[in-house]
Amino acid sequence: MKEVMDLILLFDVGNTNITIGLSDGTHIVQTYRLNTEVTKTADEYYIQMKSLFDYKRITSVAISSVVPRITEKLKEISEKYLKLEPLLVGPGIKTGLNVKTDNPREVGADLICAAVAVEDLSNPMLVVDLGTAIKYIYIKHKTILGVIITPGVNISIKALVGNTALLPDIDIEVPKKVLGTNTISCMQSGVTYGVASQVDGLIERIGEETKESFEVILTGGLSELIAPLCKHELTRDPDLVLKGLLKIFNRNDTLRK
C-alpha cells in the first residue's frame, strides 16, 4: 500500500489572490489560487478548499497575510476544522532576518517571506513581487536594506477607468506593438510595457545607489506576463513567497513543540 504523505498547508494571502501551497516539509508539491473575497465566510472558504485537496493529510498550517479579515477566516478554518493552531508570520516569529527600516514592524509578511526565500544566496538580491502593489525588496547578508512600493497593474487599470469618463476596463494582455493604435491596445501597452520599463528603470537606479551588482528575481501573479518584457537579466519564481513561508515554518516548528 502506498504511504500517504503528511502535508503542511501554506497560505500566501494578498489583496487580490490567495495562493495556497501544499508542502512535504522540504518542497512545494502543489499550488492553488483563489480570489481574495473578504465577504466570503470561513465555512464558504473551507468548502471551496475541500474540493481542491484532502484535508485529512494536513498536519500543520502556516499563514502569511496582508489582509487581516482573511487571516481571521483562515485561522478559524485551521482551528475549527483541522484542530490545528496555525503559525502566523508577524511580530514574535523567528525569521532569521535583520530588517534595517525605520519601523521593521510595518514590513509586510509577504515581503518578509520573499526575503527569507533568497536569504541564503551569496549575492545581493532584488526581489520584485508583481502583485496588487509592486514591491521591490533589496536583500544582502540576510538583511532587508530597503523597499520600494508602487501601484500594481490592476490598481493602475482601476485608477484609469475610475477617474476618466471614456476609458474602458480592459483585460491584461501584452499588445503586439508598444505604440497602441486603439484605446484598448494603448492602455494594455501602458500597463504591461510600462511596468516592465519601471522594473528596468528601478533596477538601474538601485544599482546606481548601492554601487554593487545584484541578482533580480520576479515573483507574483503577473510575473509570467511581465518578465519577458524586461530588458535586464532576471529569473522568475512564482512560488517564492510560499518557499519563504515554508522556511519560516520550519524555523519555528521546533520552538512551538
What residue ranges belong to the model's regions?
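Short Gly/Thr/Asp-enriched flexible loops that form oxyanion-binding sites at enzyme active sites
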Residues: K73-E79, Y136-G146, L229
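Phosphate-binding/catalytic loop of phosphoryl-transfer enzymes
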Residues: L84-L88, I93-T164, Y193-L202, L234, ...
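Conserved active-site and cofactor/substrate-binding residues in soluble primary-metabolism enzymes
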Residues: K40, E44, R69, E106-C113, ...
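N-terminal glycine/serine-rich phosphate-binding loop of ATP-dependent small-molecule kinases
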Residues: M1-L9, V13-T95
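Gly/Thr-rich phosphate-binding beta-strand-loop-beta motif of the actin/hexokinase/Hsp70
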Residues: K2-V29, V118, N123-K142, L160, ...
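Adenine-nucleotide phosphate-binding core of ATP-dependent small-molecule kinases
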Residues: Y32-T36, P175-E215, L222, E233-T235
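Glycine-rich phosphate-binding/hydrolytic loop that grips phosphoryl groups
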Residues: D110-C113, A165, P228, T235-K257
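Glycine-rich phosphate-binding loops at beta-strand->alpha-helix junctions
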Residues: N17, S64-T71, E212-L229
